[in-house]
Amino acid sequence: MLYPTPIAKLIDSFSKLPGIGTKTATRLAFYTIGMSDEDVNEFAKNLLAAKRELTYCSVCGNLTDDDPCLICTDKTRDQSVILVVEDSKDVSAMEKIQEYNGLYHVLHGLISPMNGISPDDINLKSLITRLMDGQVTEVIVATNATADGEATSMYISRVLKPAGIKVTRLARGLAVGSDIEYADEVTLLRAIENRTEL
């Protein structure tokens, strides 16, 4: 169906979001058009504010509005353990279970030889830098149970083991190919409790 240009552009913008197909993008576009000017302005203001005000923590790489983030500056957290995740959504998923009390490190991607993504293309160098002070004794790799997640975890283990750092992996309560952000709290809790050494 042919839509007026402003609606077609809005549909195109919504369809660029992950998991949003043309049908959902069309529904969102028409819903947005039906919103009051006040609500549309509020939505646009919040979207722009999030884009402008959020940054990545210079220590762990997590999305934050403070640098360093609240997790990195919280001295009550266990400073000897770092849980490594693919992205900030995974930090949120782990924090929901309210059982893990260590620090995080966000990679912003995974090693993917098939897609030409090497260790230099993700946030690994800063992880190694964080480990140099000797305070961290364990790194828990919490990447998704995919080929790229496995490649990343094996690389991290290979790099860190010679330094005497214990490297563990979440237990397999997570189905192969599943994303951490979609796992329920009990599954994540069991995965942390039953982690295995790499």
From Swiss-Prot:
SMART domains according to UniProt: TOPRIM
Zinc fingers typed C4-type, residue spans: 57-72
Domain Toprim: residue ranges: 80-175
Entry GO MF terms: DNA binding; zinc ion binding
Swiss-Prot/TrEMBL keywords: DNA damage, DNA recombination, DNA repair, Metal-binding, Zinc, Zinc-finger
Known role: May play a role in DNA repair. It seems to be involved in an RecBC-independent recombinational process of DNA repair. It may act with RecF and RecO.
Protein family per UniProt: Belongs to the RecR family.
Protein name in the entry: Recombination protein RecR
Native organism: Streptococcus agalactiae serotype V (strain ATCC BAA-611 / 2603 V/R)
